[in-house]
Amino acid sequence: MTSIEINNEDEYRLETSTWLAENIDLIEEKQPFSTLHWMPSRERENQHHLDCQKRQKKLYDAGYAGVTVPTEYGGHGGEPWMQRVFREEAAGYQVHTGFFNSIISMTLPALLKHGTEEQKKTHIPSLISGEVSWCQLFSEPGAGSDLAGLATRAELDGEEFVIHGQKVWNSAAIYADMGILLVRTNPNAHKHEGITFLLFDMKQKGVEVRPLIQAHGAGHFAEVFIDGAKCHVSNVLGEVDKGWGPARAVMSNESAMIGGASGDNPQQLIQLAQELGKVDEPVIRQKLVAVYVRNKLLKIMSEKISAAVRKGKPPPIHPSIVKLYVAHNRRLEGDLAQCLLGAAGVVVTNKASEWAMELLHARYPISIGGGTDEVHRNNLGEQALGLPRDIRVDRGIPWKDIPKG
């Protein structure tokens, strides 16, 4: 039975819980203190990617990925409440699909809203099934917080764009078959107006992906060099020179996704406190409650934003609030894990200490990736509170005339 054959919530919930119990491992029983995101070896990262891809396909085949996507685009044509029920029943199960979930959350709404019929029918089925891996190609060495200053150029040659430039901090790019790529197509326009959004083939000549190995050994970030690679005009998402709108939508979805992917850290922190015999200490209990409650609030906010995006409506909560909230949560979680373990928390001796070490590593990158805290505070001040904008010396100037470092 598939999701589109069920109209009763109780029946759907029963089918979902039964399928999960028969097909997916419980995190608590099979993978306590699981380390999914910050693995210190390429071998583990590669295996994690393969496992996530298989899990994405398994969820898709069972009707639990692409639940609300129309059937003509490879989805299951279900209702939004079905996604909610699945999330509720899947709590505690190992259904995380790593960066597949992340890139789908960012890319799918943009394709559904801005894509042509051909683009949607071509790309959405393989995106939501995990058959094709995607990555985001936005940030550049000289355009991170000021993304609209990007310099990767695309020049039209007949019906193809010829592209030259560099992207950086591209998660999972080493595995990607396709990418969502921002390029400069009109240097004579103001910097926000000459950008085009492309659906880009990563497996072609002229594309070089280099892993960025971090201090603790992980290499899931990459830098991408593009030297003469091509992209057909049929792969423009939206309009030429009008890519900033779809790009902003992707970034809003990214903020909501980061909040929705908050995981089960509070539950694991509680388990760790119990195992260490510290769960009854007043200060520890106070910190556990704070982390647990903030995590619940974060998921509620993220779901409200995601529900609005799925309906094509403006988000009721500014996505920057969610991004700042999750960054603060990560710091609280990392501090609490180290508080529980003490000096043992900086030496990996077992699964619990390895997990705590990863929380420690994750405390500050989340304040940078997906837009720095400072950028998101500016967004809130200007867009939500109506405060005066920062002084910009490049306002009203063509991109080509803006001084560059």
Where are these regions (language model features)?
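Amphipathic, small/basic residue-rich leader segments at the start of a protein or domain
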Residues: 1-101, 122-126, 284-285, 289, ...
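A structural signal for short hydrophobic beta-strand segments in well-ordered beta-sheet cores
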Residues: 152-155
